[in-house]
Amino acid sequence: MKFSLHDIHQFRNKLLIVLSMLFFLLLFSSCKNNIENSKITSTPTATSLKNSESSTTSRRINVVLATIDLAIGRNRLTFGLVDSDQSPLRVDSVKTDYLFMDASKIEVLVEGEAKYVQWPVSKSGVYVSRVNFDTPGTWMIRVKGIDNDGNNFFAETRFAVKSKSFTPAIDSKVPQSQNKKLSDVEDISEISSSTDPDLKLYELSILDAINNDLPTVVVFATPKFCMTQTCGPQVAIVSKLREKFEGQVNFIHIEIYENINDIDGDIEKAKISPIVMEWGIVSEPFTFIIKRNGLLHSKFEGYTSENELFDAIDRVINFKK
């Protein structure tokens, strides 16, 4: 049986809804299964790792990845931490290291730090880290930190890194999409589910933007139907940045669904936008920053703070990575 790209994307969208629900059930509410609250003197992989901190006693917690589209190259990886009482663990920053688990000799290949970013609509949030993966396959993230009571904690999980991302790769050409503009519709509600849409976000198509010799910010989000309730705030941040970079950067908002006026509270009626499928969007919100030459500068899966986007826009304006 053959499946169209639309069928595949519809299946992926439903899967993401399930994953999103599981993520929030695990991360931000209590669950029936108790997480093991044990004292450990080394990590589960420490017997084969010379750099394990065997002298440090830490309690074991859970780490839940919030990023789906991971591939070789530069990545923005986000995750949540769940304490032994099923509550989210929030500290300013944690230490991270990454191991390639398919290697004959498993060792730490990347070390870094992840900072906590609060979401604007609730007490929820995620840790944000930057990592460059050079090999596809199974990787492990290990997280170490100190809680607000001064106690050490440790978490780890495995995940897959693809050889090619669903969305355009960094430094690759982006699709020259001809998304609907304000001039193409009778009412803004046809192309925006924002309660107070910034009309300037709907003046250009991506093709228009690529051809006008300015960097471009494109945010894919559906404020009215967003699973995480971060799409509205994300579009608002993009609108605010548009005002700060007026005349220097193009800004575009594109909805996830092409029939937002027909959904009427029933998400089963939603039809994925062909532009979303063209870009390989697998979650929302998703923000891209494009160079003047139409190559992708950076991308941000999930909610991204104003400061983080501001810094990225400033870099692309000044021809920096």
Predicted regions and their residues:
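Typically the conserved alpha-helix immediately C-terminal to a functionally engaged Cys/Sec
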Residues: 228-245
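C-terminal motif of bacterial Sec signal peptides marking the signal peptidase cleavage site
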Residues: 27-30
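Non-catalytic, surface beta->alpha helical segment in thiol-disulfide oxidoreductase systems
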Residues: 292-321
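N-terminal secretory signal peptides that target proteins for export/translocation
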Residues: 1-12
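Thioredoxin-like thiol-disulfide oxidoreductase module
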Residues: 256-284, 289-293, 314-315
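Bacterial signal peptide processing site
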Residues: 32-35
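Contiguous segments within soluble domain cores/interaction surfaces
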Residues: 37-188
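Short active-site neighborhood of thiol/selenol oxidoreductases, capturing the structured segment around
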Residues: 206-227
